[in-house]
Amino acid sequence: MATVSMRDMLKAGVHFGHQTRYWNPKMKPFIFGARNRVHIINLEKTVPMFNEALAELAKVGEKKGKVLFVGTKRAASEAVKEAAIASNQYYVNNRWLGGMLTNYKTVRQSIKRLKDFEAQAQDGTFEKLTKKEALMRTREMEKLEKSLGGIKDMGGLPDALFVIDADHEHIAIKEANNLGIPVYAVVDTNSNPDGVDYIIPGNDDAIRAVQLYLNAAASAVTEGRNKDVAVVAEKDGFVEAE
């Protein structure tokens, strides 16, 4: 099963929080101390909390649940997309549009528009338009792809959110809370852990740390999905005799 060790976390700089003056007192239970006016996160708390989160994510995968990876700041954006694609899941890595979850009906209409444009671009419809009209549609398609490309095949609300930077993505977390969707989030020393079901106390800025969280989460979801496949195969008698 996907797990992360303290050594992995130390190497990735998970323990480095924000400057002490920016701290959120609600993160006090997860802080080890301070060095050079920077809070140090207690990895003895983070390691078991993250591994518990990974075990739960694997269960989501096993039930064929949908995980939405969210991280829109520069340090996380590309890694969020890669993790979602690697685990056959979904992502928002550009900008969280208000109502993406709570007003999913409207979002679904925009996704339909995006898919219509994609079909038109493929079947030659764009070529029959005037240059100006084709350019306008192409631009709108690109804009929609940037915002909704990572969720266009989600086909409904997700079963879990995996968030990088609880502070930056507080709107996404609030929407998930309103709908009862479990939230797994990396929470740094400057963030509010309220509303996060599975808190992962850790650095949310260092690219190596961000990649560590995302790679482990993607692996956990994939392992869960594959476990389900193995169980089905066993039931169907595909298991070879020793």
UniProtKB/Swiss-Prot annotation:
One of its GO terms (molecular function) is structural constituent of ribosome. Keywords: Ribonucleoprotein, Ribosomal protein. The keyword ATP-binding does not apply. GO terms for cellular component: cytosolic small ribosomal subunit. InterPro entries: Ribosomal_uS2 (IPR001865), Ribosomal_uS2_bac/mit/plastid (IPR005706), Ribosomal_uS2_CS (IPR018130), Ribosomal_uS2_flav_dom_sf (IPR023591). GO terms for biological process: translation. Pfam families: Ribosomal_S2. SUPFAM superfamilies: Ribosomal protein S2. Belongs to the universal ribosomal protein uS2 family. HAMAP family: Ribosomal_uS2_B (MF_00291_B). This is Small ribosomal subunit protein uS2. It comes from Vibrio campbellii (strain ATCC BAA-1116). The gene is rpsB.
